[in-house]
Amino acid sequence: MSDYNRQFLFETKPAQGFTPAKKPTLRQRLANRINLLTGTAVLIVGASLGAAIGAGVGIGVYNYWTRPAPVIVNNAESVSWVTAAAAKASPSVATISVSSASGGGNGSGVFLTEDGYMLTNTHVVTLDGATSSVKIEVKTYDGHIYPATVVGTDPTNDLAVIKVSSPIKFTPVEFADSSALNVGDATVAIGAPLGLSNTVTKGIVSALNRTIQVASAAAPDNSSGGGLQFYSGSGDSINLRVIQTDAAINPGNSGGALLNQQGLLIGINVAIANAGGTAGSIGVGFAIPSNVAKRIAEEIMATGSASHGLLGAMVSDSANSDAAASFSVGAKVVKLTSGGAAEKAGVLEGDIVTKFNGVAITSASELTAAVRQEKAGAKATLELIRAGKTLTLSVVLGDAGNQ
């Protein structure tokens, strides 16, 4: 018996809740093929899979709608860690369908509580920032469908909490400590790419503390450009500090789970890199760290919204020399807000911030993302360079409010 068999108590025969694989009949294979060719086409819009919401937002057409496929174990003696992790976490991951008068889309989400609170992305429940008036349905891993409503959204970190209405109890996802991750750690992604519920892919942690910039889900999305985005837009943008993984992530994975080898949540999938056009996964995906996601989810469940730190300083990228102007080495303080957190901590204009809470800062975007992931009133440390000397300052972050 394998170690994973012992850990998750797989039986020699398919365990209860698992469906043995059956070879489809010729009639079934033909019917499936016809369905794929003639089914209703759905237009992908960014991270969520959906119909066109506004002019120019279409990226590609797909129609791979199928029934959910539970984790199938045909040979319990040879299960891998991927099978074990997927079997543990799959009941906690669901497919989310969102529709409005002007369009619709699909994403993923993870259950937070037994009574139906679920975490996903803001851009999933707002159809990439197009509307707040939506109808939401959630399809669980075993194919049951329930209505849901939005509890609160956090466009700053692209997270949202919804509440599923059901008399049954759900299986909450178990959180891991994302601050304990190492580059090279194994990862598993579960979600509904292209509408294919319960899809499992694997990879590794490719990088930590990566900062990406994406269109804000609180702003209308009227562009179809490429870049480091699941969704794009011509309006406001946000900076996100994320986990980078090479596990295959595609449109529809948004809001789904990124797991460790034990099937514990390490991140909420939010974006992929693409070169524009209709490209899917190229092995560069991003997830919001579980520690950040948990903090924001708890605040939204308690108050309907989440708080964010504010440094009270305008910053810009800082190069170490004119010859190396293409590479930023920190965040230079250009202007201080009178009475703000930075000024109170002793920061001066011209200082170059190189670390925030011990993590290297090489650009203004990285500092912005790091600060906004903290809650209002959080204590933090800044390492900065002033007149060639390195200083460490303690700061109590302000409240970003609606900024």
Predicted regions and their residues:
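A conserved glycine-rich beta-strand in the N-terminal activation segment of trypsin-fold
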Residues: 38-40, 76-82, 97-119, 144-149, ...
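Catalytic histidine site
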Residues: 46-58, 99-130, 178, 359
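Interdomain regulatory linker/hinge segments that flank or connect interaction modules
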Residues: 55-73, 214-217, 268-318
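Catalytic-histidine neighborhood of serine endopeptidases
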Residues: 60-64, 114, 119-156, 167-169
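Active-site loop architecture of trypsin-fold serine endopeptidases
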Residues: 100-105, 124-133, 170, 190-204, ...
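PDZ/PDZ-like groove recognition
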Residues: 105, 239, 243-244, 248, ...
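Active-site substrate-binding loop(s) of clan PA
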Residues: 149-151, 169-197, 204, 288, ...
